């Protein structure tokens, strides 16, 4: 599939999760990301964008993969790029 043929369904279910942190640093040992918001991919992207930029590295979005543009777990810059794509469409 050519990149120009790629489509993203922003209406698919998704969850926004946040990693526990201390002093804005992710705690890794024995911890997992917890649910912050549940909705569509579009709603989770919007919710992510409301978070302070200084703490966005602690968040991730989980959704059904949509190759080649959407992976099961979306992080930082990937979320921002999808938001730009959504705004472009």
What are these regions (language model features)?
Residues 40-54:
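A short, charged, amphipathic alpha-helix used as a generic interaction element across diverse proteins
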Residues 2-15, 64-89:
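A cross-kingdom feature marking charged/low-complexity
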Residues 56-62:
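Short loop-to-beta-strand transition segments
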């Amino acid at each position: 599939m050519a990149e120009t043929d790629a489509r993203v369904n922003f209406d698919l279910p998704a969850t926004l999760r946040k990693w526990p942190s201390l002093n804005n640093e992710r705690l890794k040992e024995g911890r997992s990301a917890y649910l912050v918001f549940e909705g569509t991919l579009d709603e989770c992207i919007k919710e992510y964008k409301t978070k302070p930029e200084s703490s966005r590295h602690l968040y991730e979005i989980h959704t059904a993969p949509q190759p080649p543009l959407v992976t099961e777990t979306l992080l930082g810059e990937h979320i921002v790029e999808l938001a730009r794509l959504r705004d472009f469409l």
